[in-house]
Each structure stands twice: as C-alpha cells, then as structure tokens.
C-alpha cells in the first residue's frame, strides 16, 4: 500500500513576505517560531530584487510579522545559509547582483544584526552561494557551493567549520571518498554524521549520489543505493524527522518537481508519497522547508517565472518508541547493555544496534558517567508526552 500524506495550504495573516527564492528558514529552540531572511525575486532578470528583510512566522496562529532590522545590517542577498544557535540566526555567504560573500553575521529575534570580524590574516572560507551549512556540537560546517558568476560552472568541494565557542574558522581535512564538487545540494545532521546528496555538478548535471560524513573522523563514505533517480535533483528542500528524510520538489535537470519522498535511514528504503486530497503544493524549485512541532513548513519557490509566497504544512507524525530509542542511543553513544536488552522488545534492540552505525567507531564503547537517565527506559519515559 502506497504511503499517503496530507498537505495544508495555509491562509496566513499579518505581514506575509513577498514571493522569493534563495531565502532561508530556521526554527527557534522552542519550536514556536520560524524565521525567514533574505532571498531574491528576479522575475525581471534585468533588475533582480535582492532582499534583506526579516520575518517571524508564528506556528500557533499562522501569522507572519516583519521585524525591523538594526545594528550592523548587511547587504541584501540570496542563496546564503542560516543556522539557529544560542538564540540567534547565523547567516553565511550568499550573493547578489554585485558579487558573492564570505562574511558571517548573526540576527537575534528582535532583528539586531552583529558582524563577525575575523582577525587579520585568519583563514576564512572562500566566497560562495548555493552551499550547505549544518550544525553539530557548537560548530557550523559549511560545505561546497558555487563560487563563480551566475553563468559560471565553477563549484567547490571544500569544508570549513566555524566554532561558536572560540569564534574561529577551522579548515576541515576531509578523508575517505572523494566527493565531487557541487552546488544547490542538500545536507543535514543525523546522529554524529552529516548526510549529503543531490545538487548540481561542475558539468551542470544533477547529482544522484548520497554520502555520509562522520563529524568525529572527518571521513566521507559513499552510500550505494538504487534510489539514484529519486535523489537526482537540485534546488530542492529536505528535512530530517525522527530518522526519516523528507524530500520535496526541486529540479531534476529536465523539469520542476512537486513530488514528496520519504527515505528511511534505518532501512535505507525510499517511497514516493501521495496526497489523496490532491492538496500538494505546485511544482517549484529554490523553495525552503523546516520542521516545527512534528510538521514540515514550506515557503516560497519558483515555477514558470512565478515567485511564490505561499505557506504550506505537512504533518510528519509524532515520535514512536523506536524514535525515542534512537534518540537515547545517539545522545549517549553507548552500547545497549544486557540489562536494557532484557527490558526492551527484541525488534527495538535490533533497531538500536543498527543505528550504532551513526556513532563513530572510537565512540561506540565510550561509557559516560552514569546520569540519572542513563537507562534507556528511564530516559524514554521522561521524554514521552504521557510522562509530562
């Protein structure tokens, strides 16, 4: 039986942002607000309108609110990246009609901007756009992207990490599989690894490969899969929710898409998901999606010259027992002990053993000082909704 999903096309109130592409969305820690920054509306290619506006979307009442920016306000830009850390958005890179950027700055929820100024002669990333940025243990990892002009095929495959504690950039020495240069790909953190796939190659073709990158060993591993045609796209949106990757839309080198794909990390299986109510958003590329309270929120994108400003939601479901077990395993990075094995269903133990592959080998036998919630059952019970 084919998987189904139900989309909601929202009628939002307030200061709804104008249609755009190349913007960023991030969710705050409380998961009650989604922030939008920047982008471009270039329906008139002779006069592209690059944006530097800042909006907050209230998940509860489905309203948008524009926030006036202050402080060290930066130039308009699109195809930058953003992560949310320490109650701030951290924006890196991007481009506009005048050039490309490699500066890092932050925006707090009130709209105040602060610029990061590296020391003289410090190593910093190259200018870029259509790159990716992931967050792991207080560091932002920037990978690949495009560094040439609008019609250039020059793409990167380097990686730099920004340490928020020391406020320094670190060049990451990548080992393992040789990942081809690309832009407009997708990358996200899952466990102690980055998962990266898709994008556009230096030859201008859509990449069908998928890779894992270990944050602990800096090693890339190519994942052999028969799902290449599904992953072969660029300018798409991706979120990860409870071990399941949710892919929506994009461009496959021939046409714009509005398909929805679920890829299960544990079983390495994928399925195309259908909406029986036929409320799926229209075909689009260069849109953005985030998760908020077990829901995927999608905004914007482009199709046939139309720059959209619709807001759509897709329910992703609440956590299962298996999901809580995975969270415990990835947080503690230890083996499931004999006593825990006897207190959990066999299928759950097998599932957790499989997810140990997301923990670096040198950490698999690390036993932390026993916290009060070191037992998986205690930890899970304290976090399930019925326990609160």
PLM features per residue range, with description:
Residues 2-6, 291-297, 301-388:
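Cullin-RING E3 adaptor/co-adaptor recruitment helices
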């Amino acid at each position: 039986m084919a998987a189904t999903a139900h989309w909601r096309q929202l009628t939002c109130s307030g200061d709804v942002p104008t249609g755009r592409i190349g913007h960023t969305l991030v969710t705050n820690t409380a998961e009650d607000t989604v922030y939008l920054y920047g982008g471009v509306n270039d329906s008139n290619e002779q006069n592209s309108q690059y944006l530097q506006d800042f909006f907050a979307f209230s998940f509860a009442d489905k309203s948008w609110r524009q926030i006036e920016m202050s402080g060290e306000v930066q130039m308009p830009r699109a195809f930058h990246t953003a992560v949310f850390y320490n109650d701030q958005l951290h924006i890196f890179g991007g481009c506009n009609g005048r050039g490309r950027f490699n500066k890092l700055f932050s925006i707090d929820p009130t709209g105040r901007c602060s610029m990061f100024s590296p020391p003289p002669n410090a190593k910093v990333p190259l200018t870029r756009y259509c790159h990716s940025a992931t967050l792991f243990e207080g560091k932002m990892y920037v990978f690949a992207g495009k560094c040439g002009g609008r019609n250039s095929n020059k793409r990167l495959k380097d990686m730099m990490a920004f340490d928020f504690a020391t406020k320094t950039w670190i060049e990451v020495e990548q080992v393992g599989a040789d990942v081809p240069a690309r832009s407009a790909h997708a990358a996200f953190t899952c466990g102690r690894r980055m998962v990266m796939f898709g994008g556009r190659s230096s030859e201008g073709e859509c990449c069908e490969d998928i890779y894992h990158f270990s944050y602990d060993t800096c090693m890339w591993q190519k994942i052999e899969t028969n799902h290449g045609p599904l992953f072969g796209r660029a300018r798409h949106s991706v979120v990860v929710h409870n071990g399941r990757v949710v892919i929506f839309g994009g461009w496959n080198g021939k046409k714009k898409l509005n398909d929805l794909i679920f890829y299960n990390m544990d079983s390495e299986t994928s399925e195309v998901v259908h909406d029986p109510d036929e409320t799926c958003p229209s075909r689009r590329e260069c849109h953005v999606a985030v998760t908020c309270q077990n829901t995927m929120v999608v905004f914007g994108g482009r199709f046939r010259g139309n720059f959209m400003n619709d807001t759509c939601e897709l329910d992703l479901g609440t956590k299962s027992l298996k999901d809580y077990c995975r969270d415990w395993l990835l947080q503690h990075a230890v083996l499931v002990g004999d006593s825990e094995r006897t207190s959990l269903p066999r299928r759950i133990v097998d599932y957790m053993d499989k997810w140990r592959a997301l923990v670096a080998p040198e950490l698999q036998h690390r036993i932390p000082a026993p916290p009060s919630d070191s037992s998986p059952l205690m930890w899970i019970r304290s976090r399930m909704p019925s326990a609160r």
